[in-house]
Amino acid sequence: MRRMTTTPEPEAFLVLSCLGPDRTGLVAEVTHYLTERGANVEDSRMAVLGGEFGILLLASGPPGAIEAVERDTGALTRATGLTVQSRRTKSPESHRRAATIPCVISVDALDHEGIVRAVSRALHGAGVNIVSLETSAYEAPVTGSQLFRMEAHVDVPVGVSLAQLRKAMDAVAESENLDIEVRSLIKG
């Protein structure tokens, strides 16, 4: 008797962006929508900004499941009130760039216009890719001055030394009056 073997169906990937007024239950509703169609959350970022809740997630699943998620976004909008956009993408593994050094760049300063622009332009000029970036503004406990914090996870090409990156960040720190720390995530 001959055994039948089945090859696993290849996974498909989709980025889903959802934005709308913040309220309780949105994450539960969006993830239910995905699992009901056979898709899974691989990676996500979610935050309240002002009074709006934003969801950016990477969903995976068999091609038919991802097609159902794409096809039915109108149902998700009607059920949640969120503005929904989707875009097919490749697997995270196939996008990863070879030969990079993962680093974290932390910035602290008195808040003023142009901090993100100045840091991101310098990173771009050095050929460094921003993988994720988070910012926040807050009041200093005693003085009430508006402070700013930024943390960026970046991929530094092997051809760019950490000394070169630090030099580029030092120039931005000097011109913008920032405290910047560059830290490699590779131990050793």
Regions of interest found by a model, annotated:
Residues 2-188:
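A conserved regulatory-domain signal marking ACT and ACT-like small-molecule sensing domains
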